[in-house]
Amino acid sequence: MASRRKSTTPCMVLASEQDPDLELISDLDEGPPVLTPVENTRAESISSDEEVHESVDSDNQQNKKVEGGYECKYCTFQTPDLNMFTFHVDSEHPNVVLNSSYVCVECNFLTKRYDALSEHNLKYHPGEENFKLTMVKRNNQTIFEQTINDLTFDGSFVKEENAEQAESTEVSSSGISISKTPIMKMMKNKVENKRIAVHHNSVEDVPEEKENEIKPDREETVENPSSSASESNTSTSIVNRIHPSTASTVVTPAAVLPGLAQVITAVSAQQNSNLIPKVLIPVNSIPTYNAALDNNPLLLNTYNKFPYPTMSEITVLSAQAKYTEEQIKIWFSAQRLKHGVSWTPEEVEEARRKQFNGTVHTVPQTITVIPTHISTGSNGLPSILQTCQIVGQPGLVLTQVAGTNTLPVTAPIALTVAGVPSQNNVQKSQVPAAQPTAETKPATAAVPTSQSVKHETALVNPDSFGIRAKKTKEQLAELKVSYLKNQFPHDSEIIRLMKITGLTKGEIKKWFSDTRYNQRNSKSNQCLHLNNDSSTTIIIDSSDETTESPTVGTVQPKQSWNPFPDFTPQKFKEKTAEQLRVLQASFLNNSVLTDEELNRLRAQTKLTRREIDAWFTEKKKSKALKEEKMEIDESNAGSSKEEAGETSPGDESGAPKSGSTGKICKKTPEQLHMLKSAFVRTQWPSPEEYDKLAKESGLARTDIVSWFGDTRYAWKNGNLKWYYYYQSANSSSMNGLSSLRKRGRGRPKGRGRGRPRGRPRGSKRINNWDRGPSLIKFKTGTAILKDYYLKHKFLNEQDLDELVNKSHMGYEQVREWFAERQRRSELGIELFEENEEEDEVIDDQEEDEEETDDSDTWEPPRHVKRKLSKSDD
């Protein structure tokens, strides 16, 4: 590249020093604030041995960055800071704007209005997408020349072959110098930035620097194809890429004439992770934008924390930063647009709630633009949704925003958003973006999506994006009324609720499931007693409600707990005596409320449908509660003995019950033995079996139902120590009757086959509940550890969890027990204490009783117990 000569004195090129015939306006680039000279071919007025020094221009500022700084040619202002110089020109010289014209080179069409050029393109170039706009300055007038270039099949652009002819023409064929790099090579290690051309009026003077020698680079024009012109009603401006030899700079152009399209592009993914992808915007085109705010650390820190400040935060920032609230709001909007941050109001509120636990105000409307050419390929990379926020003038033309260094890009994207879309188009194009995570640095919101985006409906389920919508009071009221009728709704009821509430089937089912769960947790802490008042909660397992008799299965007693803990109870206004009389008469006539009766009651009582339905539901509950209480009283009268305390540890391992004011139900060992034997036979007794157990044991039916529910819960969590012993007993005896054993089977050698001594010949087994409690011994935790130690001789950490579950001991207790055995082994003393073996000792008499056909008590043999303790199914 040719060498560059720099002046040592800060200066601005005067208008008289510029070529009045033809001037090229350099485009914008992004990077650190260092000017990048780029070689550019010129027209006839510039000789081949001269070099055009690319400098940063805007509509109302002319400057050149040299070693000393910047100097204004209209006054004596000088500064080494580019932002301060920009602010000075914007505020002191706002009227340096020239007229502009638009020329279609293909048709020789000339107009002063950009809208007229767009209409011309729609009429005479329908379907054409590859427009190129070159901005030149001729005779103190800015001219935009529109040409058309073609795109090759691989995504690269056709190289202009007639470069020599282009040099001889009055205007250079390309107003922007670019490299020959094809589009597929944009993700290389070199720092490559997308460049944009902004449609604005050029400045009066163009600073340039001439050299004696120059090595012109071969050029290739790259355009960014726009979307369909019929959809956007705007045309696309050129988007070029360039390989800068040095770092490039970001300079804000001057004010843009109203109605001109603004081209927004993004920087390609950088190797340096600190460089965030940004969108270049003509910030001076935004009203009251103050570039001096870009270096304010307070504002930058606030933006990095959260890109959407509230009005109170803006007020505080205005007082601290000494800028107006309007300037700060405009600055935040420009920063969000530059960084590609575009959240919906719901997303902003959700993000603020997660980070600050507060609320935010609404933000401007957002539209999601989907690059259709990016699709899921064989490498599994998902498609990308890009969002943009409409700020300032309509007619934004968007280009591709690169995500990561590994994202393959097959062609540049030019997506056009119509300035004023119709309502239907807006609804079809609005796709909620994913909830952006509040990070220290903002990033473009992007979510994976399928290759084909469905536009059939404008409403998208928030749960699919991780956003759980809050239900309204009306929806909750309908759900509560339905829940009081039936805690397990049928499909028809779910469909009805879907139509009324507008919720999905999954949301309704989840609400019912959560409510049942909360109800069970509330019930588990309530006390159950027999001689109770009407406010006592009767614990009924949820799984039994579908198999119980109607009296028990569908009864909803008056509850002291709130079945909807996350919402306040529904309240209705008090009813008059006349209304109560009409409702009572209707209920006595028919307790089932029909639609005709409901309409009649609404007209007669002037009550709402929900109030009438709730009154009937409460009435049914109170009626069923009275019947349940009468049934409990009858069961108590039939019980002949006072119930004592429970002694079995298995029952204690069930669901916990806390004390209450009433008398807690106690079960005798005989009753517990009956229930446990029945539980081993079936965990889900039928209503007839419940009645039989209630009659034989003398317990209330509700007590039995509650016990089975608690025991099932304990069994599910592995807390039933007695289950395997009863299961073994049940396998050898059906319903309490001994089964005949095969003679000699399982007897040790030397043991006789006859009846043991001292046993009567014809004794009969009596009912279990008429005799004493069974002498069933349980393996303690140390016994299980002893069996494991005798088998393995040491503790394997992989088996630690299993030993803890079996022995019901803590992790440290198990480790200490094995450490003690190891210590005893090293000292040569007895490994096990005598009291540890007592639980395992079963005398010969008990074993004989087990093997006889007519023994009164039953105990599983020792080998069965050891086998069960080792397998622990």
Curated annotation (Swiss-Prot):
Residues covered by region (Required for repressor activity): 831-873
Region of interest (Required for nuclear localization), residue spans: 734-768
Low complexity compositional bias, start-end: 223-236
Coiled coil: none
Region named Required for dimerization: 272-432
Annotated region (Required for interaction with NFYA), positions in chain: 272-564
Cross-link (Glycyl lysine isopeptide (Lys-Gly) (interchain with G-Cter in SUMO2)) at residue(s): K159, K441, K454, K485, K629
Segments of the chain annotated as binding DNA: 284-346, 464-526, 569-630, 660-722, 777-832
Amino acid composition bias (Basic and acidic residues), ranges on this chain: 212-221
Phosphoserine: residues carrying this PTM: S45, S47, S48, S202, S648, S774
GO molecular function, one term: DNA-binding transcription factor activity, RNA polymerase II-specific
Transmembrane segments: none
Residues recorded with modification Phosphothreonine: T36
Family annotation (Pfam families): Homeodomain (PF00046), Homez (PF11569), zf_C2H2_ZHX (PF18387)
Keywords, ordered alphabetically: DNA-binding, Homeobox, Isopeptide bond, Metal-binding, Nucleus, Phosphoprotein, Repeat, Repressor, Transcription, Transcription regulation, Ubl conjugation, Zinc, Zinc-finger
Main location: nucleus
GO biological process: negative regulation of transcription by RNA polymerase II
Described function: Acts as a transcriptional repressor. Increases DNMT3B-mediated repressive transcriptional activity when DNMT3B is tethered to DNA. May link molecule between DNMT3B and other co-repressor proteins.
Stated family: Belongs to the ZHX family.
The protein's assembly and partners: Forms homodimers. Heterodimer (via HD1 domain) with ZHX2 (via HD1 domain). Also forms a heterodimer with ZHX3 which is a prerequisite for repressor activity. Interacts with ATF7IP and NFYA. Interacts (via homeobox domains) with DNMT3B (via PWWP domain).
Full protein name: Zinc fingers and homeoboxes protein 1
Source organism of the structure: Pongo pygmaeus
Phylogenetic classification of the source organism: Eukaryota, Metazoa, Chordata, Craniata, Vertebrata
Gene: ZHX1
